[in-house]
Amino acid sequence: DRAAPKLARFEEGLRASADARGHQFTNTLLGHSYGSTTSGKSVPMMAAGTIDNFVMFGSPGSGVRNIDAYGLPEGHVYESSTPYGDAVQGLGPDASYGTNPRKLEGITHLSGDTTGSANYTVATGALSFDNHMSYFDEGTRTSQDFANIIAGGKQTTDEEWEALQTAQGKITELDRNPWMKRYMEPNEAETPPPTTPDSMPGDPLARHS
């Protein structure tokens, strides 16, 4: 709570400094883990127009009870939650941490896909924290979403993400059509027996001897 007013003044200073120099920029505040709760509490303290977007990820709580408290336009408050291995997400009680961002009405939900992280692990326990630090890792869809928003854009669509993965060689035609592997990489056990004169391909009456 003590840090929230300081963060609000800092963000206001960034905006005031830019305005004084005639510099226009998209100011996106990103808050991770407990820092997202502090950020969430600071946004209502800021002067209107200080920030353009607010993104929470791996957040235990939004810092507010209602999205209107942020004073940001509709569609400019986001949350990202990896579905596995982040026990911090939504951990805090609403009374002190604010509403779980995933349940905050009116929020824009970003992809929580962190599987591209080199450190990604498949969570084996309900309280696993293994992927809590993976959101900003290179190669994740979460980091791509953040980059888009920071640049003044929107979250990555499924089509855009697939195209990007394809361009980087991470998605191939085999990934889209796994059944093709059967024909391109035949298993010896599945190799059909040699044809005989009375069992030629295409003969509906063919029988293997």
Predicted regions and their residues:
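Short, hydrophobic alpha-helix immediately C-terminal to the catalytic nucleophile
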Residues: 40-44
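Gly/Ala-rich beta-loop-alpha elbow adjacent to hydrolase catalytic centers
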Residues: 30-39
